[in-house]
Amino acid sequence: MHLRPSPQSPQSACCNPELPATEPPTPAEHPTAFRRSQAPSRTPRTFSRETLHILRENRCLAVSKVVHTPDIPPKTPASQAASNRAHRTAKHPARRQSCKLKAPNPCVGHPLRIPSPKHSPRHCTLHDIRHRKKLHPLNNPKGANKRKTPPLIQPTVLEPLPHPVLSPHNISSSTDHPDPSPAIKPSPPNNTRHILLTTKSLLLILTHPIISAYPFHPYFSFTPHEHHIRSRDTQN
């Protein structure tokens, strides 16, 4: 919806024919100015010099491309039928070709589409099978998408150590030929360290403040006999 400027505004000189002003430009003369005169008033834009140059060139091209097309006569039923026949014969070979490319089996779909793995190969067309094999990385002849299998890493098996075979030559006295691999004997227990630890733990227990004050407690500082005497004196 276009808004017309008021007669008092300076822009109304080109839009109001009653005022003594120049006539508005026609589309053939200047389409850009015509559209600008019919458009509502907007705030002016600021363009750079390069942008103004491009706009000026586009405006000249738009003026030069104005072509007056003759009026097209209305179509009659006969002309409509003739145009339909021409349209079918001239414009539809590509569409007919695309219809021929459709696969006969509806479960396969378009031949350019790769079928899903659930369909067996006998349900797919020849193009589908070739296309699927071409896209498969292992069947690619160029080897661009070929997967390189990593070398197989053999598991390391620890071989058992060879046991010494007893033979008449190996059997001899231990003094002449000592055993090359004697069995590892457990070391004897360190009795000195055990005694030191026991002594240290006893000293810690005896020097504890509660335990060390136990013999000097007032309740335990007398014998039962003295306690009996004291209790008898208090009763008297």
Curated annotation (Swiss-Prot):
Residues 1-48, 67-122, 134-192 are annotated as: Disordered. It comes from Encephalitozoon cuniculi (strain GB-M1). This is Uncharacterized protein ECU07_0030/ECU09_2040. Residues 85-99 have a biased composition (Basic residues). It comes from the Eukaryota. Residues 180-189 have a biased composition (Pro residues).
